[in-house]
Amino acid sequence: MPRVALYNIQGQQVGEVDLDDSVFGGEVNEAVLHDAVVMQLASRRRGTAATRGWADVSGGGRKPWRQKGTGRARAGSIRSPLWRGGAVIFGPQPRDYGYRLPKKVRRLALRSALASKVRDGNIIVLDELKMEKPRTKDMAHILKNLNAENKALVVTATREPNVELSARNLPGVRFLTSDGINVYDLLAHDKLVITKDAVARVQEVLA
């Protein structure tokens, strides 16, 4: 069972926390992590690329010139894909690129991402994280105390509006609740700063 230090917002160690081995102590499955990241990025694609087909190009109802006798190549419509400004055959159309991996695979990927943070020593557990008012400077100071000022993912058990607003303007810092924790954000940020209550919520869902 992994055991990590418990810190306060001043960066002082105030205890230790035992993490659930089935959630934070498993093997890191890189293939599953890759599949999960590709799935998330595919779901974010806009899918708005579009070309005009035969039915979409304006004009072309009349034959441009008679079939024979002009010396030119025969033509039936200015909408032909051979013509400049004509139709595009089998071109892209608006579509949804999103898809879903099986639930067991998604959970395995999330457990692998969390285990990678523990393995690399990039998880910081806080006793609590609350702010009386939103202030970016205060949030930057807290992260500096924790040696997590660059590319940190901040996770709390419930929505903390003041924490969220304070973290929003810091480059490389992202705020999530434990319900929104995901593989892409875990891998995209160097440090995971998570409260003790959020750890309990994550373990409750994934254990």
Swiss-Prot record:
Keyword field contains RNA-binding: yes
Gene Ontology molecular-function annotations: rRNA binding; structural constituent of ribosome
InterPro entries attached to this UniProt entry: Ribosomal_uL4, Ribosomal_uL4-like, Ribosomal_uL4_dom_sf
GO cellular component, one term: ribonucleoprotein complex
Residue ranges, annotated region (Disordered): 52-77
Keywords: Ribonucleoprotein, Ribosomal protein, RNA-binding, rRNA-binding
Pfam family, one: Ribosomal_L4
GO BP terms in the entry: translation
Cysteine-cysteine disulfides: none
Tree of life domain: Bacteria
Quaternary organization: Part of the 50S ribosomal subunit.
Family assignment from sequence similarity: Belongs to the universal ribosomal protein uL4 family.
Function: One of the primary rRNA binding proteins, this protein initially binds near the 5'-end of the 23S rRNA. It is important during the early stages of 50S assembly. It makes multiple contacts with different domains of the 23S rRNA in the assembled 50S subunit and ribosome. Forms part of the polypeptide exit tunnel.
Protein name according to UniProt: Large ribosomal subunit protein uL4
Organism: Moorella thermoacetica (strain ATCC 39073 / JCM 9320)
